[in-house]
């Protein structure tokens, strides 16, 4: 039994930590809008990833990434929202007052 592979190339942004760009083929950015390319900066290659493999992405669903690449030619993963340190502190110290 053979499983089809859907490899994608993953790049990180030098301008925004935690922002990643997924494209169908390595070094092919034709489908990425120019404005996004400018905002993203010069893509830094991270790895090739099999979207049909057993491994799952940490912050995005493999199926969503694959669908976006097939329909628009790329997938942009935004950085996670910043942690609210005050809220975390208050929750941890709730009963200590």
Curated annotation (Swiss-Prot):
InterPro entries in alphabetical order: YcgL-like_sf, YcgL_dom
Pfam family, one: YcgL
Gene3D superfamilies in the record: YcgL domain (3.10.510.20)
Residue ranges of every copy of the YcgL domain listed in the record: 6-90
Superkingdom, natural source: Bacteria
UniProt-listed PANTHER family: PROTEIN YCGL
The protein, known as: YcgL domain-containing protein APL_0712
Organism: Actinobacillus pleuropneumoniae serotype 5b (strain L20)
